[in-house]
Amino acid sequence: ACGRGLCGREGFELLEAARGLALIEAPFVPVRTIFFDQRIVRGSQVVLLGAGMDARAFRLQWPTGARVFEVDLPEVLALKEQRLGGVAPRCIRVPVPANLTGNWVVALESEGFRPELPSVWVLEGLLLYLDESLVKSLLAQVDALSAAGSTLLADVIGWTMLWMPQLQPLHDFVRELGAPWRFGTDEPEELFEPLGWEVTAYDLGTVAAEAGRWAWPVVPRVIPGMPRSFLVEAMKPAGRRAFEDVLE
């Protein structure tokens, strides 16, 4: 019920308007949601970057004392508070009004984030809307704030998804909404190589097929030029310094 309220009427209207666009019926969102849900609750300090109307603070069973920091634009979080109407979270929820292109790190730490503790970072439905340079700088900032044992969860679309003609109606739709897709890669592991994180990139089709939610053949990654998306789980191993420290 909380999730439906956060979506608002316009959320359902957008979903209806998007029906019939290429690949829109693929079960990407529910499969991604379950994948992240199973991993997020392992942490006692969680940061949602570009949190939007995420309802996990209210619907998941959290460890005692867990803190969930929700980072997003001030106007987004203000609308979220209005729609929540006083609903109580199941954790210590900490809204952090900040722009990810600005000084969000200072805002996060001022709200009580403790970089010496392992964290779970969630970049859900975010990276595809950012330029590649911003994607890399954002990951470097996350690395600098992460203690050993921290986890990062993200979804990444394949490069083919940015240009294939069959997706043009969907690209036109999101562009009109002011949210064009900007970033994709067929090798998401390479984003983390400079950071030294241990990363596993799961093909969405494989994850969905294992869950009985995929109606199409799963195409091996060695076959290029195919539309695909990835669910990424990365962990910062012990003994790793922040990437920024290595450069000094």
Identify the meaning behind each predicted range:
Residues 120, 146-160:
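Conserved beta-strand signature within the Rossmann-like core of class I S-adenosyl-L-methionine
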